[in-house]
Amino acid sequence: MQKVFDAIFEEINFKFPNYCVFNKSDSGLKIESAKGFLRVCYNNNAQLLRAGLIVKANGLDLEYTIEEQPRFDNLCFMVDCSRNSVKNVESVKKLIRNLAMLGYNSLMLYTEDVYEVKNEKLFGYLRGKYTIDELKDLDSYAVSLGIELIPCIQTLAHLNQLSRYSNRYIPFDCSDILLVNNDRTHQLIENIFSTLRECFTTNRIHIGMDEAGMLGRGRYLAINGYKDRVTILKEHLSRVCEIAEKYDFEPIIWSDMFRNEFNCDKYKNKDGKVEIPKEVIDSIPKNLSLCYWDYHGLTKEYFYDGLEMHKQYKNPVWFAGGTAMANRGILPHLQYSFKIAESAITAALEFGVKNLIETMWGDNGGECSVFAVLPALAHYSYTALGCSSERLKKEFYALTGHNFDDFIRLDYPQTFCGKYTDDIANPAKYGLYNDVFTGYLDPILNANDKKYFIQACEELKKCKEGQYFYLFKTAYALSDLLYYKYGLGIEIRKAYKEKNNEELRGCLKNLDYCIRKLEILIRLYRKQWLIENKPHGFEIQEIRLGGLLERLKGCKLRLKDYLNGKIDKIDELDECLIADAVGRVKPNNRCDEYSYMSIASVNSFDGYTYIDV
């Protein structure tokens, strides 16, 4: 118990009083408090940590009784460590403490190639991978605090970082998909399971296998001829599950390859419901769990068809929802995440799902801080536990030292100060990267919307200092930059077309502000990254933001030359912009999360890997 007490003190500076009585229980958590009396009944160490948070939040010497009965067998958080932001060991330990105090009982580290594998020297090469010793240390720490640390890997697709190497190392079918029915592939998976068995206490392992739509369409097709995807998938899945069983692992997969294959008219009955062929259901390995993932529904009914389909399987079912982070950039989208969580958890309860995962994907660079989404993690767990919003806010403050509503202000640059929370847009990212001369997005943006960023600055100023104050400083720096940059391309083009040199001189001054404020953002964001992550991967952010910095400097020089008569035109500004060219437009002239990639020129904001087939 001492390790638990030490963890509580380290995270929230709280010690149970000497008169506290601790009783082990076979059920949930129960805390009874009165003047000079405190009793904690708990089932495991994670509940004991949670008790520490609850008592700190509600006080000593006050009369109250709090009981919690978990409504789910597994309440898990999955954090993406594969998109450059490999969380450092201390950050993972801090996350483990936070999860236990918030009511979670398991953690998945999503690692495509960022972990050491014996006899695979290129696995995680130069990527900041977790070493075997680091994984052992994290597993031991998690177990001591009652958190199950579950490996979450890939054994079919999403291995594009390995596909850059010669096929003599690892054979690929096409794109990021391994060549299945291949001895070298089987040896790789054997080495993976052998290594992970040495590192982890748990018998659970998530083996991925999602989004492999081109399975069997590349080198596999050339070697074996045509087979339908489901047949190939079942053969590979059977082989991987055999290897998993050899090492006493119980695998879980993302189920979309099955879900997408059968979610079509061919397999629907007269009522429009999908009926999965019995031979498919019977062919799925018995030691396998299926994880239905869906990150977008704002009503519980949205999830019904997917959950109904999964009831047909004989295998255990997990459900994975998500914080709205993927592709969003440096800042979270918390209020949208709250709405998804409420609808998804309600649907999962109605369908009797017993295992929940809250995911935080880091697509396109892992830019958002894992601790910036603590409100979403807390809201998810408290919704799953059936706790009140009053308790959520009180206990969140006890955990972080920050008001829950202050944390929500991190949303403001993304939602125009809370004006839009019912859908996903990404102004803090596309506004950052939209070019000031070739502003592909300018035709559908409103330059006056820059006012929301100065409002966001004013709101972020209200946030008090604390252990996560560095997150607010980064968000402030980004908002401060966007106030000057968001509509700058529109203003430059308008003044240029009107030959209004006085206005152009004002734009030149704003370009200079942008340069200085971007330099501040880079400095603060670098500090934030190194607090939480291994340094590997930040070179991508330095290249992106550094490239943006040089682009702004270049535009400033050319605009200055134009105003000084050294050049008689700016070619990019002479070209007319076409609104119809902009895709993925949201209402009120906003764009979705992918639009930042759409500058006019071929670019490297989102990378592609080519391999021989």
State where each predicted segment sits.
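Substrate-binding groove of N-acetylhexosamine-processing glycoside hydrolases
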Residues: 1-27, 33, 47, 97, ...
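Feature activates predominantly on carbohydrate-active enzymes
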Residues: 2, 35-246, 252, 318-321, ...
